[in-house]
A protein has these predicted regions:
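Alpha-helical transmembrane segments and their helix-entry boundary regions
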Residues: 10-11, 85, 200-204, 231-232
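Small-residue-rich hydrophobic transmembrane alpha-helices
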Residues: 87-145, 149-151, 184-203
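Short alpha-helical transmembrane segments in multi-pass integral membrane proteins
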Residues: 2-56, 113-180, 222-261
């Protein structure tokens, strides 16, 4: 806004962000402390498929934000009009920060879990998962505390004109939508965990459920049942379905392994 480029400036800033991120990462990559590099090797189709399986969950996670935004915008537009969509913009922008925190936690734990799993250290793997979930729970508690005590303050960042209707929509939306993060953070960590311990099927199912399938179905059904509030609580419903599904698949996989042994 200070430059006066308007929406063009917002688009330009969005394009510059990944370039800045890559530039920062390049500093480490080119330093003497880095021991990871690219080497020419004959490609293996089987190895490529294996790597892709482990990466599908992350791909779906990146894709889901766009899908959710499109579905939510259309549903909210039909129920609450442009002001409802504006309220969702407030909720969505703040949720990006929360998702980024949990994704950072999961991405930080994933290589440590993967290393311990590769070394055949199941005790260390369980310990890392336990600590990851504990930190996740602490962050979730902090987020809920901030949302419920500073709702109007957070909304005012995006509501410079003090629109009362926008405030009312966003106030309810922010509190209901962020209830979903009580479970969302745990799911993000679990998906990263199962990718790290070479269980791509559970990770893929979890990603597709929470990122596309469950969230879309829950949003459509709950919107018809409860209107705008139904859309706000669809995240909690979808994440709960995903969590229960992951637990079921993990339990089923564990029983199968015990039967083989």
């Amino acid at each position: 806004f200070p430059v006066g480029l308007g929406f063009s400036g917002a688009g330009l800033a969005t394009a510059i962000c990944p370039i800045v991120t890559m530039s920062v990462c390049t500093i480490h990559y080119r330093s003497s402390r880095n021991h990871v590099g690219f080497y020419w090797k004959k490609p293996s189709f089987r190895h490529l498929i294996s790597c892709c399986q482990l990466g599908v969950s992350a791909f779906v996670g990146e894709l889901s934000s766009g899908v959710i935004a499109i579905v939510f915008n259309f549903l909210i537009l039909g129920i609450a009009g442009n002001m409802g969509v504006a309220a969702y913009g407030v909720v969505a922008n703040l949720s990006i920060v929360a998702f980024a925190i949990f994704n950072g936690l999961a991405q930080g734990a994933q290589p440590l879990i993967s290393e311990s799993y590769g070394k055949g250290q199941p005790t260390q793997v369980r310990k890392l998962l336990k600590w990851s979930l504990l930190v996740c729970f602490a962050v979730e508690t902090l987020i809920q505390l901030i949302i419920w005590t500073s709702t109007d303050t957070l909304i005012s960042i995006f509501n410079s004109e003090n629109n009362v209707q926008l405030l009312n929509y966003a106030h309810t939306g922010l509190r209901l939508y962020f209830l979903g993060f009580i479970v969302a953070g745990i799911n993000i960590v679990l998906v990263a965990y199962f990718s790290a311990v070479d269980e791509p099927k559970i990770a893929i199912v979890g990603s597709f459920l929470r990122g596309i399938i469950a969230i879309v179905i829950c949003a459509v059904i709950l919107a018809k049942l409860f209107g705008l509030n139904g859309i706000w609580i669809s995240l909690l419903a979808a994440e709960t379905v995903t969590f229960l599904t992951i637990l079921f698949l993990a339990y089923k996989d564990r029983r199968k392994r015990m039967a083989v042994v």
